Amino acid sequence: MTDHALLLVNLGSPASTQVADVRSYLNQFLMDPYVIDLPWPVRRLLVSLILIKRPEQSAHAYASIWWDEGSPLVVLSKRLQQAMKKEWSHGPVELAMRYGEPSIETVLTRLAEQGFKKVTLAPLYPQFADSTVTTVIEEAKRVVRAKSLKMQFSVLQPFYDQPEYLSALVESVRPHLEQPYDHLLLSFHGLPERHLHKLDPTGKHCLKDDCCMTAPAEVLATCYRAQCIQSAAAFAKRMGIADGKWSVSFQSRLGRAKWIEPYTEAHLDELAAKGVKKLLVMCPAFVADCIETLEEIGDRGAEQFKEAGGEELILIPCLNDDPNWAKELNRLCERAPLML
């Protein structure tokens, strides 16, 4: 049967490195209530203040990592889409971005016009967060309601602990760990602490007594930090990396609110101060390289680490369009449960 479409969804990117395009993208991204979870008037005011200087700064950062083909995240996501076409046997494989183009609305509308009524929605985020997974699902729901689409959705669940994801990660990273190195840092995207607190159904566990490795299932299901910590620990165990030779941190903090710690920026200085000279960094919250990996870690992070006394920071590529990752991702998508 070829009547079941697969829709891969990643975060998105500005259309270009022009300041106007970056401003438009940031406005759409930051005005999402799942990203900045404040009342609309407060969110609008805050985003308006951010958009005074941030677009120009971000445009410069994007320009430093932009490829001839376009945004690295978009290009790599398209390559993964092509790789998935060799694996998914039930119908077309489409790609959408939560922010920017091609939008979820554009792609779902086209699939509906082509007669597809079964769609597996695959948010490409290993760990759960409202600002990634939930917003993708809610946007799909909004489109279905607004367009009166007759579709059934299976939804890929967070796969931070799934053997397929961990296997793909291990095989992708293994060659990079064959070189001598002092320390491996797993840098995950950060979140405001309040995003975690509000999702703790018990109100008792979040960020208390180092609960990330012992959180009960009901808490773990929606705790981003715990899922990151457990992803990292499972990866290190599979790789046989000794305790003390790897660590976890959280990057990309925005604003003055308290975010989950330790912060990558501070941790880089700490590692250099401890005598780490050759540092390997991987970013397991991202399945495709993007501005947060290439510019924030590969460029700025590497420069900061050297200034702090380190000698070399090597960024390990994300899974990107690795053929083995495509095979494992297909296995995950095959068993995505019917949800919508």
Curated annotation (Swiss-Prot):
Pathway(s) the chain acts in: Porphyrin-containing compound metabolism; protoheme biosynthesis; protoheme from protoporphyrin-IX: step 1/1
SUPFAM superfamilies for the chain: Chelatase
Domain of life of the source: Bacteria
Keyword NADP attached: no
InterPro entries documented for this protein: Ferrochelatase, Ferrochelatase_C, Ferrochelatase_N
GO annotation terms (biological process): heme biosynthetic process
Gene Ontology cellular-component annotations: cytoplasm
Protein name per the record: Ferrochelatase
Gene name for this UniProt entry: hemH
